[in-house]
Amino acid sequence: MYDSVIIGAGPGGYVCAIEISKLGGKVCIVEKNGFGGTCTQRGCIPTKYLHSVADIVRKMSMSKAYGIDSKFDLNYKILKSKMLSTVTKLASGIELLLKGNGVEIVEGEAEIISSNKVKVDNKILETKNIVIATGSIPVSLAGYDFKEKILSTDTFWNVEELPKSIAVIGGGYSGCEFASILNVLGCKVWLVEMAEMLMPDQPQEIGNTLEKYMRIDGITVLTNSKVEKITEQGILINGQNIDVEKILVCVGRKPNINSDELKKLGIEFNSKGINVNKKMLTNISNIYAIGDITGKYELAHVASKQGEVTAHNIMGHGNEMDYSVIPF
């Protein structure tokens, strides 16, 4: 029997697993979508890779002002291949880290049978504790599923060629980041935000300054605007038809929960995520939840700290989360 079975090998899950092992526990981690979670596979790492390329492109495009004549073509297929290679390398590093610390790895989709049993395919894992670390998934626009034309921040990475034009829906962190990067890489970008300014959860000066420089860079910014309709040609906003090849939805993320499974187990949750206390414990005495699925903060370092706290509680070394010291 394991001291813990952890479902999800993101920055919360794999840190928790390694910490339990270091504290002398027997631990198993289950993963179905690649090691490192959203951050490594579909978030921070590939986005920052694109950002680094965009930074090079921006500098090259400005080089003539400094007396340097340069011409270049962007080959997105090569760029994407290099980016995916970086993701694979980092994910493999996490896998090796887990194995090197004595963590047992099971690949597949987990189903919690009871508070002491987890099923993966036809295999039953018996455990004293369970840690749910299944992360979050993108929120879609009401009435529109993600498909070939409508992309999420997860499915964007499946695109083989950069679109010539794109509408980015949502002017928060992700939307502004994607809009800026894609604009530099040669896409015609429309950035749509329903609030009065970009980054609506930040001071007005930040949103206004950001909008100013985005407009200078050639991005069409539409604030106080809402998508009225999506068509084969593009989108209808404020009564205006905008023709775009792709639509990238960046309106937030939601906990990746199996509500039927949680109800069956009696685990308390709401639309924001699974309810936990400062020990990361649910209302079930041996089931914990960490990371985005708790609805606290969608930050990798928060998930990792939650994983560490959980590991210490599972192994009998009482510990609690202190959210007042989180760097943003």
Residue ranges and their predicted role:
Residues 3-29, 175-184:
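N-terminal Rossmann-like FAD-binding beta1-loop-alpha1 element of flavoenzymes
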Residues 105, 132, 152, 221-223, ...:
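A structural signal for the hydrophobic beta-strands that form the central parallel beta-sheet
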Residues 242-266, 284:
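C-terminal catalytic lobe of FAD-dependent flavoproteins
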Residues 278-297:
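Short FAD-binding loop at a beta-strand-to-alpha-helix junction that anchors the flavin cofactor
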